[in-house]
Amino acid sequence: MKLNELMQAIPVFTGEVSETIEISHIAQDSRKVKPGTLFICIDGEVVDGHKFASRAVELGAVAIIAEKQVDVSIPVIYVRDSKRAMAMLADYFYGSPTQALKLVGITGTNGKTTVSHLVEQIVRENGEQTGLIGTMYRKIGDQILETKNTTPDSLTLQETFRDMLLSGVSTAVMEVSSHALVQGRVYGSDYDVAVFMNLSQDHLDYHHTMEEYANAKSLLFAQLGNSYHTSNPKIAVLNADDAESVRMQKATAAHIITFGIKQEADFQASNIKITSHGSTFDLGTPVGNFTLKIKMIGNFSVYNVLAAIATSFALHIPMEKAIKTVESIPGVKGRFELVHAGQEFPVIVDYAHTPDGLLNVLETIDEFAEKRVFVVVGCGGDRDKGKRPQMAKIAVDYATNPIFTSDNPRSENPRAIIEDMIQGVPESDAYVVHENRRDAIRFAVNQAEAGDVILIAGKGHEDYQVVGDEVIDFDDRVEARIAIEKKLGLA
C-alpha cells in the first residue's frame, strides 16, 4: 500500500507524504521493523519509541509517525496522538475488518472472561464460525493463540480481525479492558454490541480515581456509533443493578438492552436457588419466561448468564438455543473451578482478584458451606495498593480461616504486600500468613475436613507466578491437586 493512500486514515497530520513510498508492514516495536515498514513512535509508560526512530531506519523503516521531533533521514509525519493514529492506520492497513465482522465488546471489572466465553459458545452452537479475544487467549475458529494482554495493541488486534475474516469467522467476541480504552487500542473497531458488566475497585494504580475508571469504561459506549437507519442497529447491553450503567447509557446513542436481578430489566432473573452443584432461576425476557438450570454456581454466575443471553438476543440468536447452550456449559477455567482429587471437601480455584470479586465468591460459598471456609488469598505487586486492605477485610469477614499469601509479587517484597493487606484487619481477627503460595495451599488442604470449603483466590487460570523478573511455573489447580494427593497418601 502506498504511504499517501494509507495516510487517508488520519484526518489531521503534518509532514509531506510521498506518493512513491510503499508500505508493506507497520510496527511500533523497533525489533519488529523490516524493509518497507512504517514505524510508529509511541511514548509509552516504560519506553519512549521516539528514542528508537534511528534504529528503525537502520532496520529498513521507510517512514516514521511521531508526536515529538525526531532527526532521521526518512520522511516523518507528525500527529497529535500516535496511539490513536496507530489504531486508525492499523484498521485501514488491514482493510477495516470489523466492518465485515459482527463484533461484541465486553467490559467491566468482573465477569468479562466468563461472559465472552459464554457468548462465543452460544454463537458457535448457532452454527457460526467464531473468534475470541481475551484474558486467557486469542481464538480464531479452532486455532488458539497466546495473548499477553486482555486486549492486544491495535496492530495485533486489527491483524487478528483480518485473520478471522480470512478464516471464515463471522462473529468476534472480545474482552475490552479499561487500559485498552484509554490507550486507544480499540479505536477504529466497529462494535455491533457493547456489554457493561459492573464496576468496582481495581486498576486505581493506573486510573487513580473511580471516576476516571468509570469514564474509561464509558469510552466503549461512546465508540458505539449511532445507526438508527440500518438493519442491524448498534446495541448496548447494560447491568441494570449497577449504578454506573447510567453513565454508560448517557455515553451512547445506541439502543439499550438491560439485564439484572434486583432492578426491573429486559432480562431478569428471579427465584434464584444456589447449591454446591449449580444454580436454578426463572428468567423473564422480551420473548417469554423460562426456567434455567445451570452448572455454574452463585449470583455472579447468574449475572454472567443473563449478560450472555441478553447479548445473544442482540445478535438475533433464538432464545431456546442460547438457553440450551448456557445450561450445558460447566464453566470457564479458573472461574469457580472445582478441583477433585478424592477429597471430602470442595476446593475451588477462582480468579477473584478484586474486593468485589472476592466478596461475590465468598458470599456464594456461604450459601452451601456446612462448616469452615478457608480462603487462600494475596494481592498482586506493582498494582492498585488501595485494594489490599479491602481484600484482607473481606477475607476475615466472610471466611472462618483466612490465609494471606503471595499472588504475583512482581518487583515488590511479598511480605510488604501482605503487611499492606493486614492493615485492613483488626488485630483481634484470626488469620494465618504463609508467604509462600505453595505452602499456603498445602496448609489449607491439610487443615480442611469433611464439610469445609477451600477457596484459592486471585490467579484462577494462570499457570505462572511473577516473582521479581522471573516468571515461574505455578498453577493453583495443580498445586491443590498435589496437596490433596499427598494428604490422602496418593503421592
Swiss-Prot record:
Pathway where it operates: Cell wall biogenesis; peptidoglycan biosynthesis
Main location: cytoplasm
Keyword Thylakoid: no
Residues with the N6-carboxylysine modification: 217
Pfam families cross-referenced by the UniProt entry: Mur_ligase, Mur_ligase_C, Mur_ligase_M
UniProt: UDP-N-acetyl-alpha-D-muramoyl-L-alanyl-D-glutamate binding residues: 30, 149-151, 177, 183, 185
TM segment ranges: none
Gene Ontology MF: a single term: tetrahydrofolylpolyglutamate synthase activity
Keyword Nucleotide-binding annotated: yes
Motif extent (Meso-diaminopimelate recognition motif): 407-410
Cell compartment(s), UniProt: Cytoplasm
Modifications after synthesis and translation: Carboxylation is probably crucial for Mg(2+) binding and, consequently, for the gamma-phosphate positioning of ATP.
Annotated positions binding meso-2,6-diaminopimelate: 383, 407-410, 458, 462
Protein residues bound to ATP: 108-114
Cofactor needs: Mg(2+)
A GO cellular-component term linked to this record: cytoplasm
Family the UniProt entry places it in: Belongs to the MurCDEF family. MurE subfamily.
Reported function: Catalyzes the addition of meso-diaminopimelic acid to the nucleotide precursor UDP-N-acetylmuramoyl-L-alanyl-D-glutamate (UMAG) in the biosynthesis of bacterial cell-wall peptidoglycan.
PANTHER family (alphabetical): MUR LIGASE FAMILY MEMBER, UDP-N-ACETYLMURAMOYL-L-ALANYL-D-GLUTAMATE--2,6-DIAMINOPIMELATE LIGASE MURE HOMOLOG, CHLOROPLASTIC
NCBIfam families membership: murE (TIGR01085), PRK00139.1-2 (NF001124), PRK00139.1-4 (NF001126)
Record-given protein name: UDP-N-acetylmuramoyl-L-alanyl-D-glutamate--2,6-diaminopimelate ligase
Organism of provenance: Listeria monocytogenes serovar 1/2a (strain ATCC BAA-679 / EGD-e)
